[in-house]
């Protein structure tokens, strides 16, 4: 029996070791970059398509991380999502330029009033005010990348989770005619803002029904706002998921094929 347990333990360790090595390899595909303007810097990681050719044009994806991955190490933002875009299979099927920016610890992607004394947290999203510093830099960086000849401007995409889902909704409000499609996981926003992009941007919204960090009602209200303003959103509400509904979202077999199938006219 001891021998069987030992063999089983070794197999588990080998599988875990292989999985960790694969994740490390996928993260290594993302080069460390810095967007610098005046005295401000936005760290980001950049993955180019396999056999990148600057004379060709490629779709571009912006992925916005959650609050837990904020910082200045230019690494933590790859914890969630990098394996989805960096897998060998998806790089073959969906060649794209993928950008993972990192929001500093003391900032937020979206302009949000956050009260963490409640569970789920209380959130309010004022409209028509200046963007946060990180959002401003992100907007500027987006504008700069959009001028590059190897970026297909008809195939710009954005997505994010938690705080990044909130940032996704705000980015769509600020740039309603820019993105070909978007996805927001366990996020939140101001339903009134959906009027700007409901009819122009296909979106897939995800949330866990048991989310005790960001109330799933927040996504329901955003979807309702999109519907009322003429949009046709996809909505996946996972009955058993808590806040980590990104695991289920990333496992959706149609997510990337749906995302990249959309083109901006």
Across the structure, where does each feature detected by a protein language model lie?
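Gly/Ser-rich "nucleophile elbow"/oxyanion-hole loop immediately N-terminal to the catalytic nucleophile
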Residues: 51-56, 110-161
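C-terminal catalytic histidine-bearing segment of alpha/beta-hydrolase fold enzymes
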Residues: 185, 193, 202-265
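The conserved beta1-alpha1 loop
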Residues: 64-65, 207
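A domain-start/cap signature at the N-terminus of enzymes
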Residues: 21-60, 68, 96, 133-140, ...
């Amino acid at each position: 029996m001891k021998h069987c347990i030992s063999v089983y333990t070794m197999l588990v360790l080998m599988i875990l070791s292989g999985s960790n090595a694969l994740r490390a390899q996928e993260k290594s595909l993302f080069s460390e970059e810095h967007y610098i303007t005046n005295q401000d810097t936005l760290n980001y990681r950049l993955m180019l398509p396999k056999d990148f050719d600057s004379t060709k044009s490629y779709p571009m994806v912006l992925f916005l991380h959650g609050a837990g991955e904020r910082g200045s190490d230019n690494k933590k933002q790859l914890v969630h999502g990098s394996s989805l875009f960096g897998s060998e299979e998806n790089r073959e099927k969906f060649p794209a330029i993928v950008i993972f920016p990192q929001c500093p610890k003391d900032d937020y992607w979206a302009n949000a009033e956050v009260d963490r004394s409640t569970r789920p947290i209380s959130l309010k999203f004022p409209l028509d005010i200046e963007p946060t510093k990180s959002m401003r830099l992100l907007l500027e960086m987006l504008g700069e990348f959009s001028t590059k000849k190897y970026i297909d401007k008809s195939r710009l995409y954005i997505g994010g989770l938690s705080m990044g889902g909130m940032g996704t909704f705000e980015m769509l409000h600020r740039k309603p005619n820019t993105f070909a499609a978007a996805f927001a996981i366990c996020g939140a926003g101001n339903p009134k803002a959906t009027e700007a992009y409901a009819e122009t941007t296909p979106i897939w919204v995800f949330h866990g029904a048991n989310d005790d960090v960001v109330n799933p009602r927040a996504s329901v209200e955003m979807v309702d706002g999109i519907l009322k303003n003429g949009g046709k959103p996809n909505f996946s509400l996972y009955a058993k998921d808590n806040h980590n509904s990104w695991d289920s979202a990333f496992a959706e077999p149609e997510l990337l094929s749906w995302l990249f199938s959309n083109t901006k006219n």
